[in-house]
């Protein structure tokens, strides 16, 4: 590439740097600061990894910031949904905290053992949808 003929590579093999806070020490499960609950963190800096995960955290921050302004209790996450599981992950004590993306391994276990992977994922999805409906009802009522 002609335009790069004088380029110098300072460090090989690094595509991006992930900067994040020590969320388990600093954040509550609604992404607000434990010491200053009026301050919220969302996105990569909160310890979630990925675009969708960052958007989900931002949505949770927005909803809970609005609820706080209205004098209402924040929506506390549950490990039944990936959004909730990520929120619990970033706010739970962890000696070696590293950012996490959405994955089935962080979800609250199902009440039953399902060996078929497709059926297990479907069960997780159905449970998450039911829990999301419950949260949406709570948000719209409050």
Q: Predicted segments — roles?
A:
Residues 1-48, 55-56, 75-89, 97-103, ...:
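A glycine-rich dinucleotide-binding beta-alpha-beta segment and adjacent secondary-structure elements
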Residues 48-51, 119:
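A generic structural signal for short coil/turn motifs at secondary-structure boundaries
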Residues 50, 54-57, 61, 124, ...:
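Generic hydrophobic secondary-structure packing signal
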Residues 54-77:
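Internal hydrophobic alpha-helix adjacent to the cofactor/substrate pocket in enzyme cavities
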Residues 64, 85, 131-134:
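Alpha-helical scaffold segments in soluble metabolic enzymes
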Residues 100-142:
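C-terminal auxiliary extensions adjacent to catalytic cores
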């Amino acid at each position: 590439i002609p335009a790069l003929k004088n380029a110098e590579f300072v460090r090989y093999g690094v595509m991006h740097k992930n900067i994040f806070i020590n969320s388990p020490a600093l954040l509550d499960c609604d992404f607000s600061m434990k010491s200053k609950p009026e301050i919220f963190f969302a996105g990569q800096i909160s310890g979630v990894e990925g675009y969708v995960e960052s958007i989900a955290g931002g949505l949770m921050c927005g909803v809970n910031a609005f609820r706080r302004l209205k004098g209402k209790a924040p929506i506390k996450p549950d490990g039944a949904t990936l959004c909730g599981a990520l929120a619990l992950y970033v706010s739970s004590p962890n000696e070696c905290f590293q950012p996490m993306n959405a994955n089935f391994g962080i979800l609250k276990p199902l009440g039953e053992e399902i060996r078929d992977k497709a059926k297990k994922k479907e069960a997780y999805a159905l449970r998450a949808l039911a829990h999301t409906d419950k949260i949406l009802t709570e948000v719209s009522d409050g």
